């Protein structure tokens, strides 16, 4: 099956510089049906990366500054921000290098460029894997805090959290090396897809279980205070909306990229599959959008973190 170069497309982030041509353009040839290819302008791509870079840098700086935020939960959030930060940095760096090379402003030997590209490729792949892992870790941490509240501090200790974080980083680096080495194997692509599906199922099961438990708890309190059903229903709708945002953002931002990999592995020669695969840069831009949204969902909802963020911003002025 001709999958050579497919994983390089994943870890290579932008194998060619996004053009500033019209955002929607039909891609046609004599053998393929008309396709709708979405072009991401290079300026927009770089802006998204820079916004994510600034946002996640602030999260890491705030958590590092405030000792009250050095709990296991915030350690996982900090590592998620660091992973998203690396995703943004590596993609912005690769795009900038490609632009400089095309403009002739950067002169380097082919071997040096190749080695630099390999390093950036591995950084992109490892940061994506670690980002998915820490999203799962945050879901598990919240699950334990709800269902094992009395034993939470004995189960999720800072030492265990640090060991788990170290294991995630080591596993991410090793997996990126393996994926990059065996990029021409269909199995490598399918492993990535299975890993994404496993994280999606894990998060869905944990958050749905947490929502049902919270709804039951709210109903119990309502009965105790003899409240009416609209209050219970309103709380349930709020919880369902939160769950929809958590899983919806995860699926919408990460799903297209892994659909891209699945189609490359399953139907690389099919015209319809080829039409979808051509939108790789759009899928990559969605990953960077996820890196922008993650701090809003997981970090900035904390009152303590927002308070420290204000102090950091005021001090910087």
From Swiss-Prot:
Compartments reported by the entry: Cell membrane
Entry protein name: Melanocyte-stimulating hormone receptor
GO molecular function: melanocyte-stimulating hormone receptor activity
Function: Receptor for MSH (alpha, beta and gamma) and ACTH. The activity of this receptor is mediated by G proteins which activate adenylate cyclase. Mediates melanogenesis, the production of eumelanin (black/brown) and phaeomelanin (red/yellow), via regulation of cAMP signaling in melanocytes.
Cystine pairs: none
Gene name in the database record: MC1R
Transmembrane segments: 38-63, 73-93, 119-140, 164-183, 192-211, 241-266, 280-300
One GO CC term, this protein: plasma membrane
Entry keyword annotation includes Nucleotide-binding: no
Extracellular side: 1-37, 94-118, 184-191, 267-279
Topological region Cytoplasmic: 64-72, 141-163, 212-240, 301-317
Organism: Varecia variegata variegata
Primary location class: membrane
Residues linked to a glycan: 29
Self-association and partners: Interacts with MGRN1, but does not undergo MGRN1-mediated ubiquitination; this interaction competes with GNAS-binding and thus inhibits agonist-induced cAMP production. Interacts with OPN3; the interaction results in a decrease in MC1R-mediated cAMP signaling and ultimately a decrease in melanin production in melanocytes.
Biological process terms in GO annotation: adenylate cyclase-activating G protein-coupled receptor signaling pathway
Family membership noted in the UniProt record: Belongs to the G-protein coupled receptor 1 family.
InterPro entries assigned: GPCR_Rhodpsn, GPCR_Rhodpsn_7TM, Melcrt_ACTH_rcpt, MSH_rcpt
SUPFAM superfamilies referenced in this protein's UniProt entry, alphabetically: Family A G protein-coupled receptor-like
Pfam families from the UniProt entry: 7tm_1 (PF00001)
Membrane topology designation: Multi-pass membrane protein
Keywords recorded for this protein, A-Z: Cell membrane, G-protein coupled receptor, Glycoprotein, Membrane, Receptor, Transducer, Transmembrane, Transmembrane helix
